């Protein structure tokens, strides 16, 4: 369990197959094959409501609305994760660049990249694909596609959102 009350145990093979079967082709390309959606096209880019952004594949909360900011890059950007342990950093040397890829710590799905050019207080910019995320408005139970019972972890979704 994380400090915020979520189980990071990876999905079983059967659970993973079930979750992957529910993805659109674009979601599968980004989440499973490390693709990138076109800039300025993502459905969550202009989302300004209070709530939580969770992993589209497994439902783990990854970012809060209050850490989202307008970066001008064309992808939703956040200056901090929901819980540091929910987002995993992996060195990415694809396309002749050295970057830090961000993945969901529970299901290992690709989310985007993190760069050291964000606003205070962290100085980080988590640049995330909209199709990698699922938005849950404050006051609505978080998704629990794995049936772990942690979708109301600590019962603080309204306060944490």
Description of each model-found segment:
Residues 1-6:
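Accessory (non-J-domain) regions of J-domain/Hsp40 co-chaperones
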Residues 7-161:
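A short Gly-Trp-Pro
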């Amino acid at each position: 369990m994380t400090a915020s009350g979520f189980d990071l145990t990876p999905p079983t093979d059967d659970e993973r197959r079930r979750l992957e079967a529910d993805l659109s082709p674009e979601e599968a390309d980004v989440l499973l094959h490390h693709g990138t959606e076109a800039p300025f096209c993502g459905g969550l880019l202009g989302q300004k409501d209070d709530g939580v952004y969770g992993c589209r594949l497994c439902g783990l909360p990854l970012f809060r609305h209050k850490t989202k900011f307008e970066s001008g890059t064309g992808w939703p950007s956040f200056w901090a994760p929901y819980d540091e342990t929910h987002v995993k950093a992996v060195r990415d040397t694809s396309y002749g660049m050295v970057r830090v890829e961000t993945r969901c710590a529970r299901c290992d799905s690709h989310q985007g990249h993190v760069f050291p050019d964000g606003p205070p207080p962290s100085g980080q910019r988590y640049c995330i694909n909209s199709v990698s995320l699922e938005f849950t408005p404050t006051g609505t139970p978080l998704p629990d596609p794995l049936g772990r019972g942690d979708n109301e972890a600590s019962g603080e979704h309204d306060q944490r959102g």
